[in-house]
């Protein structure tokens, strides 16, 4: 591209005017002595749109005014102003004697539409046509270079500008300053600024905006301070430029000072200022003030609406974001791509598929369905609404996939229980030479954590290290979480201890890891260590601590944390916190307290609260509270067969066979099914899956023969099958059914295919049943093996006939 500046073999051919206009060129009807008084001239002066201009153009030709310099200049200028540079060129080309101002206007037009190639071609043509460049020509070109981040071309124009004698011109230097800032070369922009023999408000505003837009917020504020020290009053552009820096630093006190200055200067009524203030207050956490400003605006543009929608989305209030979006539509404001993306983000957070589909349809009507950023937002929305296949279909049709597109799909699969698909897409992405970023690796690590396969965990850890991202706090936090979920809690702690920087999410991941492994005391110790530092715990921290206490029977410590959350840290309680408290009390057998806690909740209990209560009733075989909890669960979530199965198990433990039958009939009537149990074990880098009673595995005969002998051995050691868990068949058949549960098959296969002393790692999609839990303790005893089982709730470390959960799960 840069060679265009020094040599062109041919002058670019710009289309001639339409033939229907050519015959007018020689016609000259009556023209007043002063062309400015001609009706066509008056129409051009009042022209306010491209449509009007196209209607006026034939009048100019018809009246023979085309050769008048006034009309030539006015037509070219207006077509450029309205962004129709091709039509401006069709007016420009046939002119016999072109004034220099026409060349300058055309170049400005190309710059306005940010067409660098055509702007450069036209600039070279000007040299061929002996048009001497003026300083503004260079500023136009520099503007386009900045808009397109073309640093190399921008530097060449800088060189030409110096050769042309404009190196110290204020306008030229301001243009250079702006170009370097937009090309993310802020230090170069600052050098230009410092070399200026004189500076005006525009040059100061340019450097302020440069710092602000390039993430150097403190420097932006410093420049405003220096500007004021030189007795230059900040303009409304200064305020709009510096407010994003205030937002980035969350300096609301400074923001309020700027707001006060804007009011005293009379700028607060300007729509750009009001919009920037709304954005600043929202990003500084003062959403109420932002909304008051927004509601008080006498005039709003689409950017104002977008700022308010984004404010609610970023402050985790998607319901209000959708209300603002709806109000925007009701007031007839046409949404932009930014509006649509904000609304889609809100729908994703709400899991509102219906409204998400409506916005999808709206985006098609607005012609935004080919906008890659909008499509990426649609993919994310469908993934969060559990419509992953719809998202994958959109991704497949997307012609220009960006890194964001790949990341959205990988995360979507990871969050929807399809980790294998996530890894496959990651592999495809790398094969297409798309370079992964931090977000990609965090998503892939999340998928591997879901798989809970140590080999995969070590593989991605190696990839991360080779990518030099093993010191990135987001990636290392994900690694801590992944290793904990893969059963390697010691490796997780090792990575945690080696981290030079930790976020609250890092502490949360490690505390949660200890909790799911049943190491409640270790979780509490780490929580105490966290409180001594500078990072404050958040709601997720307390949820992890309470859950850790629940899994370890540390009831009093859990209660203390629950009340500390509100009293010491002013953290709002969520439904998850209430559910964790019911689980804490219920697991400990304090069912009366748990039920009283539910009844006294200040908000209506949700499914997770009653689900925790029902789970506790199964542990402690309490039919009374189980029926109460189940009744509420069937109302709140009638389509989940899991709660019906749980209630049936409680009835079965109480030998209430008639009730068991009623639950079964109810499930059949509603078409509800029990989720089949599946256990997975990794052997020699390959994952093997087993379902209860299945003979699909190629080594089934060996597995069942080995398992039969193993059952005999553990019976000799004291194992007694819990036949109460099976109904409707004879005792010997009950034992046979119990012996072929998926956990036992996976463990047997692991023992058959590993050497003595090797730890067996098993993953199950459901809660481990009581019989398998008991049997696995005996298996660890008679084989001398450590067996780690991860079920849907926690980890169980079986060793020497005991489990880390202490039979408390």
From Swiss-Prot:
Q: Determine the domain of life of the protein's source.
A: Eukaryota
Q: Where in the cell is it found?
A: Plastid, Chloroplast
Keywords of the record: Chloroplast, mRNA processing, Plastid, Repeat, Transit peptide
Q: Which InterPro entries match?
A: DYW_dom (IPR032867), E_motif (IPR046848), Pentatricopeptide_rpt (IPR002885), PPR_At4g14850-like_plant (IPR046960), TPR-like_helical_dom_sf (IPR011990)
- Region labeled Type DYW motif — which residues? 716-809
Q: What does this protein do?
A: Involved in multiple sites RNA editing events in chloroplasts. Involved in the editing of the site 7 of ndhB (ndhB-7) and site 5 of ndhD (ndhD-5) transcripts, which are two plastid-encoded subunits of the chloroplast NAD(P)H dehydrogenase (NDH) complex. Involved in the editing of the site 3 of rpoB (rpoB-3) transcript. Required for the activity of the NDH complex of the photosynthetic electron transport chain. Possesses low endoribonuclease activity in vitro.
Return the protein name.
Answer: Pentatricopeptide repeat-containing protein At1g11290, chloroplastic
Instruction: Look up and give the organism this protein is from.
Output: Arabidopsis thaliana
State the encoding gene: PCMP-H40
């Amino acid at each position: 591209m840069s060679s265009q500046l020094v040599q062109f073999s041919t002058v670019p051919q710009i289309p001639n005017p339409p033939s229907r206009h050519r015959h007018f060129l020689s016609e000259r009807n009556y023209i007043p002595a002063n062309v400015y008084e001609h009706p066509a001239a008056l129409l051009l002066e009042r022209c306010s749109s491209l449509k009007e201009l196209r209607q006026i153009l034939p009048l100019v030709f018809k009246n023979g005014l085309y050769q008048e310099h006034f009309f030539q200049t006015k037509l070219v200028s207006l077509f450029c102003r309205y962004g129709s540079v091709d039509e401006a060129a069709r007016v420009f080309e046939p002119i016999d004697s072109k004034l220099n101002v026409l060349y300058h206007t055309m170049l400005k037009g190309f710059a306005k539409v940010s067409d660098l190639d055509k702007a450069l071609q036209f600039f070279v043509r000007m040299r061929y046509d002996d048009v001497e460049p003026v300083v503004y020509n260079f500023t136009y070109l520099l503007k386009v270079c900045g808009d397109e981040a073309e640093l190399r071309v921008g530097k060449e124009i800088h060189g030409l500008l110096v050769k042309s004698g404009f190196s110290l011109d204020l306008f030229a230097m301001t243009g250079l300053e702006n170009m370097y800032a937009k090309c993310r070369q802020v230090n170069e922009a600052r050098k230009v600024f410092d070399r200026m023999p004189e500076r005006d408000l525009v040059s100061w505003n340019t450097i302020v905006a440069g710092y602000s837009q390039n993430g150097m917020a403190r420097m932006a504020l410093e420049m405003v301070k220096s500007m004021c020290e030189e007795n230059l009053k900040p303009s409304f552009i200064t305020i709009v430029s510096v407010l994003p820096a205030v937002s980035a630093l969350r300096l609301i006190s400074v923001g309020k000072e700027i707001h006060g200055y804007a009011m005293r200067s009379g700028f607060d009524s300007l729509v750009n200022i009001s919009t920037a203030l709304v954005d600043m207050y929202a990003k500084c956490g003062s959403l109420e003030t932002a909304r008051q400003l927004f509601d008080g605006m006498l005039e709003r543009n689409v950017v104002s609406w977008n700022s308010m929608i984004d404010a609610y989305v970023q402050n985790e209030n998607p319901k209000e974001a959708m209300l603002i979006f709806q109000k925007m539509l009701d007031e007839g404001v046409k949404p932009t791509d930014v509006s649509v993306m904000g609304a889609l983000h809100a729908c994703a957070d709400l899991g509102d598929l219906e409204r998400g589909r409506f916005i999808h349809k709206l985006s098609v009507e607005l012609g935004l369905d080919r906008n890659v950023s909008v499509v990426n937002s649609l993919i994310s929305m469908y993934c969060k609404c559990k419509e992953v296949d719809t998202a994958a279909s959109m991704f497949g049709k997307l012609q220009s996939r960006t890194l964001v597109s790949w990341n959205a799909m990988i995360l979507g699969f990871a969050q929807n229980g399809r980790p294998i698909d996530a890894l496959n897409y990651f592999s495809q992405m790398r094969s297409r030479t798309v370079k992964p970023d931090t977000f990609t690796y965090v998503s892939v690590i999340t998928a591997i954590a879901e798989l809970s396969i140590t080999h995969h965990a070590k593989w991605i850890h190696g990839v991360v290290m080779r990518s030099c991202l093993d010191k990135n706090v987001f990636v290392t936090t994900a690694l801590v979480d992944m290793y904990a979920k893969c059963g390697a809690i010691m490796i997780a702690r090792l990575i945690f201890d080696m981290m030079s920087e930790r976020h609250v999410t890092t502490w949360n991941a490690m505390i949660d890891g200890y909790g799911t492994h049943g190491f409640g005391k270790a979780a509490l110790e780490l929580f105490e260590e966290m409180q001594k530092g500078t990072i404050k715990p958040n709601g997720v921290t307390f949820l992890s601590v309470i859950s850790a206490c629940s899994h370890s029977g540390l009831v009093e410590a859990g209660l203390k944390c629950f009340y500390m959350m509100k009293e010491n840290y002013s953290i709002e309680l969520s439904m998850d916190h209430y559910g964790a408290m019911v689980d804490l009390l219920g697991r400990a057998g304090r069912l009366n307290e748990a039920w009283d806690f539910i009844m006294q909740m200040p908000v209506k209990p949700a499914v997770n609260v009653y689900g925790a209560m029902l789970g506790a009733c199964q542990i402690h075989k309490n039919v009374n509270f189980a029926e109460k909890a189940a009744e509420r669960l069937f109302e709140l979530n009638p389509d989940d067969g899991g709660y019906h199965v749980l209630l049936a198990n409680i009835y079965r433990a109480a030998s209430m066979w008639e009730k068991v039958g009623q639950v079964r009939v109810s499930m059949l009537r509603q078409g509800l099914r029990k989720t089949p149990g599946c256990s997975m074990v990794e052997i020699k880098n390959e994952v093997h899956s087993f379902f209860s009673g299945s003979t699909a595995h190629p080594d089934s005969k060996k597995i069942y023969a080995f398992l039969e002998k193993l059952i005999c051995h553990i019976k000799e050691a004291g194992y007694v099958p819990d036949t109460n868990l099976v109904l409707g068949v004879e005792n010997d058949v009950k034992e046979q059914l119990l012996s072929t549960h998926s956990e036992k098959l996976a463990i047997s296969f692991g023992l058959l295919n590993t050497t003595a002393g090797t730890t067996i790692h098993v993953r199950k999609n459901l809660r481990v049943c009581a019989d398998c839990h008991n049997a696995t303790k005996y298996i660890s005893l008679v084989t001398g093996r450590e067996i780690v089982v991860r079920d849907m709730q926690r980890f169980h470390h079986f060793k020497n006939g005991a489990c880390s959960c202490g039979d408390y799960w």
